[in-house]
Amino acid sequence: MRRVLIILAPAVALTSLIVIVVLLVQYRTHIRGHSLGLPNPNLDPRPSNMLGVNIELLPESPGTIDKTLNAISNTGFGWVRQTFYWEPEKFDWVATDRLINFVIENNLQIIAVLTSSNIPDQTNKFAQFAYEFADRYSDQVDTYQLGDEPNLISAWGRTPSAVEYSNLLATIYPLIHQADTNATVLMAGLAPTTENGPENINDILYLRQLYASGAKEYFDAASGKPYGFNTGPNDRRLSNSILNFSRFILLREEMEKAGDSSKLLWASQFGWYDPSAAANPQTTWGAVSDEQQTNFTIAAIERARGEWPWAGVLVLDNYYPGIDIHNPRWGFALTTPTGANGKTITDLKNYLSVYQLSAAPHGIHPAASPYAQYSDGWSFSNLGADIPQIGDSNITFTFEGSEFGLIVRRGNYRATLYVEIDSEPANLLPITQKGESYQILTAPDLSTHVELIPIANNLKPGKHIAKIRADRGWNQWAIVGFSVGNEPAYDITFITLGALFLFLAACGYMIYNLKSVRTFLNDMIMYFTNRVNMLITLCLGTVFWISAGMTWGQNLPQLFVRQNEFVPLAVTTISALAYYVSPWLLLSLLSLTALLILFYLRPDVALAMIALVIPFYLYPKPMFERMFSTTEVFTLLATAAVLMRNIINLSSLSPDISSFRLRLSSLDKAVLTFATLSLISILSANELGAAITEFRVIVLEPVLFYLLVRVIPLTRTDLVRISDYFVIGAFLVAIIGLIQYTLGINLIAAEDGVLRLRSIFGSPNNVGLYLGRALPLAIAMSLLSQPYISKLRRAAYIVASICMFVAILLSFSRGALLLGIPAALTAIIFYYKGKRAIRPFLVLLAVTCTILIVFSSHPRIASLTDQTHGPTFFRMNLWNSTINMIADSPITGVGLDNFLYSYRGKYISPDAWQDPNISHAHNVILDFSARLGLPGLASIMWILYTFFKTANRTISTTMDPKLRLLTIGLTASMINFIAHGLVDASYWFIDLAFAFMLTISIIQRITNVDDHAEST
């Protein structure tokens, strides 16, 4: 039985984990587009009647128009959408007057679609027509739609252009609002299509292009056409290549990405096509039966009401498409060519009579909503509803959902709202001794502002009644609106918890019987590995031997053994350059494949290449319409190569490596703790996307680099090579900057016109930060003497040191010149000279003081004493704001890469308004505390303590001059990290993060360097 459980436990753990992942993916798919919780109060209110229908009644007789509109109104529709075609000197104002008058008489609202056969060529004349139309009907029409399907060549009149349509909106939008101050201007309904031009443009892409061209300010609501095509409204697949009702969500997501989430998204045409109802059917819109058409239509309305608070009016296509019985759009029609009602309109009328105005759906609703019933005495305006001073002040609001909130105007006044839901106290409000739930309207800070207050949640699905009684608060316009939330009915909680329980139970059993489970897994892995190894070895061997035959005509692996260092370094460098500079995707991919093979053969060289390209992350490689940092690509390739080596050699791991993996050093534990806390901090981030990105590129990938240095067998030569390549990368940064400075390009003018070098970085301060990490290493290694170093190599270190120092000097980085570099040089002197360090230290101190005195009048130095406007003033304000930020979130911090949003949105001092876009605290202690909380600060302190303890022990005990000076250089670099980090960035840039992990990983590896390791 025990053996059976040992066999079943891994299977149960894996299966339950897969089930959990599948459930979460399905849940994400199901709720996509569904606004969870209470909708944002900035969202525009939903129309009380959200259903409309397209009509084509202009050429009809007055009797037919009146009869048709009366039938539409009696069905329960609140809107009709009519297209008005304009041609120069050919518009029929009389017919338009007649139609609009009948619309108003039948208690309907009209969406007036203004369009023409060739709008782009006559924008000014068309704009004049739109102004005249809005001016003429401003008392009868409030909703105007400019054009229709501009993403199709057939509607736009020529190749579609989002820029042209954006310009049209920019021209006409202000004219309509000038003529009709209550107007709602709709963007043209975008036709759903998967084409990407040139004749037709994907509706999702077209909307993205509209926002990119600046159209956001020139429409009040967006518009799409969520036809169902061949599937029902509960087809929840979402893709640019899929046409279905859910495609509407993709348009909404584009709006949110563009920061336009406060507007509603209207459906100017939607429905399902029944080809049997058309004399001349088309397959363009898919095909369903009449029964499906009815059921799908009602289900779509239900879904939009219950899931999409951002959905505006849904306009069916159509009541009837006109007098032409051969029009293929009869397949959408609610009536037949003979005038009889179809099945859809009959069932729809029954549905609307019950649900249309019975309860407020998911969304935002204005104070004057028809779902709200007020006692006598209330006043209403654009500000909301004002509490009466005399008499009752009650509100009854009927809604359908699981959450309810009030949008109120709070301020420096005394008022109380007493609320009950379904005759019970509201579960999110405090309760008086009398058992009444209440909400105080006095603002905590006494400022006047509009706020959404959650009232109740976890309500049963269905209709609910909220009763509100106000005590005081008149003349404040306290009630602004109502917010209704509706949690998804799709609940996976119990199944997920069950699967999680099985997963944890199986894992617990495996841990308890770890030895037996490990034996079983090792047997299984060896069984499959023996069979997979043959295939992998055969494939890789073929590639290697073909490459050898085509290039050098000799055994490729022999070229990569440690006795021949030039070939692997040269080939790897050439492959890296080919990947980076190649304009052809195929060559880039082939180069990446070659690099993967090379990294597999020599992972130690991979580490050196990563160290080399660290500062060049700002110049990513474009592939697959994305940008990839070379540092990131090389790190992931090296990780993949090491994993491949371990998988292939799993059955023959040496005892040393196995035991090493089981013995984590204190520094390893500190780094893993830091990474874990960083991952956890994502949960506290308001800007989740920014936090995840920073975790990936500034925490996870640098930690991967640290782990690679720790697990790859490395010799002393390998460690020195990694540090040398790190110095070479910094040297290249310095050379590029010096050339730019000589040519007078890519410079920044500081105080009094001082030109500052910035090389490849966006700021001169980044030059000082990065070169400050590499300069101590170059200086320390230049102190080596023969026979431990050749004259040429020592000269190279000296030249690199001089170039980097000059580059730092020309960057005028005060943090580097006044703190970082002096502190690092002091460390080198004391570590290298020991008891004889006093004299050279005094010389350094004298030189530093002399330079400070000489340059004290320099604008970059003199500005430090400005306590009212200079950098010191702004730093003090920034640090004070950061302390307040930490005080509010001492445990979790504000999350990775959320400093900017928290600082700019809440904590910035009014005196520091000139520079709101600061993304870090400019202090190593405050920065880690603000991002990760005090536990995060403790983790970095643990890392630094362990680092210096290890480094000091190595410096005092090692007998190898090269390793001793390498350790001194790395220690001085870390001291630069601390000193410069007191006033500027420390870790939270990609290059600084990799430099930090490189420094601590090499220090740790020096303690167990393997002089006999070979990366073969």
Predicted features along the sequence, with ranges:
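Noncatalytic carbohydrate-binding groove/subsite architecture in carbohydrate-active enzymes
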Residues: 162-291, 334
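Transmembrane signal-anchor hairpin modules in multi-pass inner-membrane enzymes, especially those
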Residues: 5-17, 21-26, 495-680, 690, ...
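Aromatic-rich peripheral "rim/lid" segments of glycoside hydrolase catalytic domains that contact
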Residues: 41, 136, 145, 150, ...
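A membrane-periplasm/extracellular boundary helix in multi-pass inner-membrane enzymes
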Residues: 542-560, 580, 627, 648, ...
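Alpha-helical transmembrane segments of multi-pass inner-membrane proteins
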Residues: 527-551, 562-572, 576-578, 591-598, ...
